[in-house]
Amino acid sequence: MGNNVVVLGTQWGDEGKGKIVDLLTERAKYVVRYQGGHNAGHTLVINGEKTVLHLIPSGILRENVTSIIGNGVVLSPAALMKEMKGLEDRGIPVRERLLLSEACPLILDYHVALDVAREKARGAKAIGTTGRGIGPAYEDKVARRGLRVGDLFDKATFADKLKEVMEYHNFQLVNFYKAEAVDYQKVLDDVMAIADILTSMVVDVSDLLDQARQRGDFVMFEGAQGTLLDIDHGTYPYVTSSNTTAGGVATGSGLGPRYVDYVLGIIKAYSTRVGAGPFPTELFDETGEFLCKQGNEFGATTGRRRRTGWLDAVAVRRAVQINSLSGFCLTKLDVLDGLKEVKICVGYRMPDGREVTTTPLAADNWEGIEPIYETMPGWSETTFGVKERSGLPQAALNYIQRIEELTGVPVDIISTGPDRTETMILRDPFDA
């Protein structure tokens, strides 16, 4: 039996993690975010009602689940309050269900200003960040000058620290980026107005999780973005600023690494990517447009159109290696309905003619790569809303089997629609 289950993306994000976390939390006591910030966009559809969460864990919609934001998450007080209000306006009691680590770094206005100024300065070489201050906040954390949730317990000291760090960043904004300085008093006033709300939710997350482990409680760890956006293992520098892989669970929550029991990798039936960066299987033809339209591939956070392409088994195998995946959840299978043929990338042809079956790490080394495809028959029957494996077309079953063969990982869950009811659980991670 797996008490501590990790759910993470195996591609470039947007795989459908939010729905699956929400579904599996029916049995969980706690749901923990361990990395990223409000650059995530987790979409849940419950009884036809759509909810988009950016910062608060997806378990917040469950009455008997406690949601936790761990120390690996960079926390925007403004974004958190906005999201809390949106949920509370719908009658969802967030403050009674949400806990914070006091070690969460804070994202403040100057982080956002730096993020925007840097992207503007990069011009055509822009990374394609969400412009929400995620990277600059992680920079401050590593540089040991960042402000954290726990600093709000001593408001006078917080004000002094804020003044010092803002002098540093405003100097960059004005003198290097030729941008406007951020007003110190406004930042201080905005944070102080909600400081007591934030500190009232603080808990020792590592200790809480250890006690939960000893009691045998079920805990779900919710990843954001995807493996191929990991700061170390992704398509650097076109990556996010945190560890999106399973290793981030221990460092971003305080759970001992030996206590992770099952790692569920969410894999979309095709590939998508938002923003710049390598994407070998990207489609620029009518099939790419079909995938975008049928899959409603527009970012939940930015609204940007996602780039679309065929499933890249080479890249997914890298995710399998890094995360030691226990099983897959295959999402958006129904988007492929109606295609005469479907393709899977099984290797890369390098510019010098060599054929390889592993991914490069640096983005520059992806240039000139051509995907090697395996083509399979498509299916005309609908898979949308199918709730039994036996109800899937044989061609769809063959596609699923081929994914398992190419990756060495079983497909334990199949999603055939956006609602939590449109799901087949072939093997429950909490029972694995």
Swiss-Prot record:
The lineage of its organism: Bacteria, Pseudomonadati, Pseudomonadota, Gammaproteobacteria, Enterobacterales. Substrate binds at residues 300-306. GO terms for cellular component: cytoplasm. IMP binds at residues 14-17, 39-42, 130, 144, 225, 240, 304. Binds 1 Mg(2+) ion per subunit. This is Adenylosuccinate synthetase. It catalyses: IMP + L-aspartate + GTP = N(6)-(1,2-dicarboxyethyl)-AMP + GDP + phosphate + 2 H(+). The keyword Ligase applies. PANTHER family: ADENYLOSUCCINATE SYNTHETASE. Homodimer. Its cofactor is Mg(2+). Its main location: cytoplasm. CDD domains: AdSS. Transmembrane segments: none annotated. The keyword Hydrolase does not apply. One of its GO terms (molecular function) is magnesium ion binding. The active site is at 14 (proton acceptor), 42 (proton donor). HAMAP family: Adenylosucc_synth. Keywords: Cytoplasm, GTP-binding, Ligase, Magnesium, Metal-binding, Nucleotide-binding, Purine biosynthesis. It comes from Klebsiella pneumoniae subsp. pneumoniae (strain ATCC 700721 / MGH 78578). The gene is purA. GO terms for biological process: 'de novo' AMP biosynthetic process; IMP metabolic process. Mg(2+) binds at residues 14, 41.
